[in-house]
Design a protein with these regions (language model features):
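Signature of N-terminal electron-transfer/Fe-S-associated modules in redox systems
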Residues: 1-194
Length: 194
């Protein structure tokens, strides 16, 4: 029915004062490049990436923040882009899967490929960006819900249990979890000893 009052015609809705004020300008950095978009304030980051910027690597899975297919990084932290309003990104740094590696595969992408950590591949961009964030969190010593030693200083130990917990926001409908855990383990490098 448009942006106007419920039951109003689309033409009437377009002429309403609400329609005139329904565009916001947002400036942010995407994959290292400055962006400036004029968007409906209700537009999600996912829709801005896919429909306005034509970056289709980020996938629309559930559109409810439950599957992780739309995971991107905002200021280094993973977010569900289907739940993030693009208007909230003023001044933020966003990384989509397209920004992870330009000329060759990143070590994380190479590990996913080497370990066959996908089947259909639909969830893979979100899985990979979650892995990027996971490795950064572990390096900084950020604990998870299953971290055994909360007093440990330095990088977190990435056991298979830790990896599964830290990747639990990403669903693989094909069931490639064993290979995903192996790929994350490979990307993390050799285990650190205390």
């Amino acid at each position: 029915m448009g942006l106007g009052t419920f039951g109003a015609s689309p033409a009437a809705a377009a002429d309403s004062p609400r329609a005139a004020a329904s565009v916001v300008k947002v400036r942010f950095t995407l994959n290292g490049e400055a962006q400036e978009l004029e968007l409906d304030p209700r537009a999600t980051l996912l829709d801005a990436l896919r429909e306005r910027l034509h970056l289709t690597g980020t996938k629309k899975g559930c559109d409810r923040g439950q599957c992780g297919a739309c995971t991107v990084l905002v200021n280094g932290r993973r977010v569900n882009s289907c739940l993030t309003l693009a208007a909230t990104l003023e001044g933020a740094g966003v990384m989509s899967i397209e920004g992870l590696a330009r000329a060759r595969l990143s070590p994380i992408q190479a590990a996913f490929l080497e370990r066959d950590a996908f089947q259909c591949g639909y969830c893979t961009p979100g899985q990979i960006l979650s892995c990027v964030a996971l490795l950064d969190e572990a390096k900084r010593g950020v604990p998870s819900a299953v971290t055994a030693d909360l007093h440990r200083k330095g990088p977190a130990a990435l056991t298979d249990e830790e990896i599964r917990e830290r990747m639990s926001g990403n669903i693989c409908r094909c069931g490639a979890y064993v290979n995903i855990v192996a790929a994350v383990r490979d990307a993390a490098g050799p285990p650190r000893t205390a």
